[in-house]
Amino acid sequence: MRRVTLFLNGSPSNGKVVAVYGTLSDLLSVASSKLGIKATSVYNGKGGLIDDIALIRDDDVLFVCEGEPFIDPQTDARPPGGLLGSHTDWLTLNVGGRYFTTTRSTLVNKEPDSMLAHMFKDKGVWGNKQDHRGAFLIDRSPEYFEPILNYLRHGQLIVNDGINLLGVLEEARFFGIDSLIEHLEVAIKNSQPPEDHSPISRKEFVRFLLATPTKSELRCQCANLQGVKMLCSNAEGASLRLCNFEDPSGLKANLEGANLKGVDMEGSQMTGINLRVATLKNAKLKNCNLRGATLAGTDLENCDLSGCDLQEANLRGSNVKGAIFEEMLTPLHMSQSVR
């Protein structure tokens, strides 16, 4: 008869002395009963896997595992004896067909209210959800799960190139990793390209005009047109709502002689703009700021100027037949218009 001393994997204390009979399966059954675990493998003190009962000698010291890798009791930092609880033992996860080995403490301690913590804080809760290798089955994307597991290990968000942050964010929300969700939302926001608020050049605007069919509307709502020069341009039927034509440096936008028939420029900022002899027939300029604008000789027939600020605007020689001047912000003096 041979006898051996059995210890839990990684533990140097609280061993059990048992007799060795029959096959290796018989020894694993005895170990499971004595140590209160589901024994699947046995190692010697040097980490060698015992796969044959004949390899065991009398008075050998053996370490019993539940499927996790061998842990050397001489170097393992886990607390001894009764402190070796369910929150420090190893387990393997099968996430979408890919295996991850970690500890219960990693899944439980950092985010105790997460789904992973609830799944694994009590030993054996998910015992019926294991594959043939004993790994716990989780039907999620392994590519997005890996950054989450690493975050639970060391507290840093590290995502490899080629992995979509939005995918990691959805997994973090699914597992309830609240602190990681905040990191990911900031990272996604910082990864977005900055908005371009630079002024549009005359060359760029003319290119828009040339690329737009004559029967189609040109839409430039909210464009920044500070100091733009568009002399004699043809923008008939264009939409220029809420555009900014005012340059803080003092350079004034110049649309002298431009064809702006039917243009929608409602709410645009056009202080000091030059619209001399431009055609604005049937245009919509409601609520525009036209302070100091040059509208001399401009065709404003049937133009809607309701709510505009025309203080100090030059309207001499302009055609205001059928123009609408309702709800003006400042009085319109007769000296400003002769026609």
From Swiss-Prot:
Function: Substrate-specific adapter of a BCR (BTB-CUL3-RBX1) E3 ubiquitin-protein ligase complex, which mediates the ubiquitination of target proteins, leading to their degradation by the proteasome.
Residue(s) carrying Phosphoserine: 11
Domain KHA: 3-82
Gene name, Swiss-Prot/TrEMBL: Kctd9
Quaternary state and interactors: Forms pentamers. Component of a complex mades of five KCTD9 and five CUL3 subunits.
Pathway field: Protein modification; protein ubiquitination
A Pfam short name: BTB_2
Ranges for domain Pentapeptide repeat: 223-247, 253-292, 293-327
Keywords, comma-separated and alphabetical: Phosphoprotein, Repeat, Ubl conjugation pathway
Lineage: Eukaryota, Metazoa, Chordata, Craniata, Vertebrata
GO molecular function, one term: cullin family protein binding
The BTB domain, residue ranges: 89-161
A Gene Ontology BP annotation from the UniProt entry: response to virus
Name this protein carries in UniProt: BTB/POZ domain-containing protein KCTD9
Keyword Nucleotidyltransferase part of the UniProt annotation: no
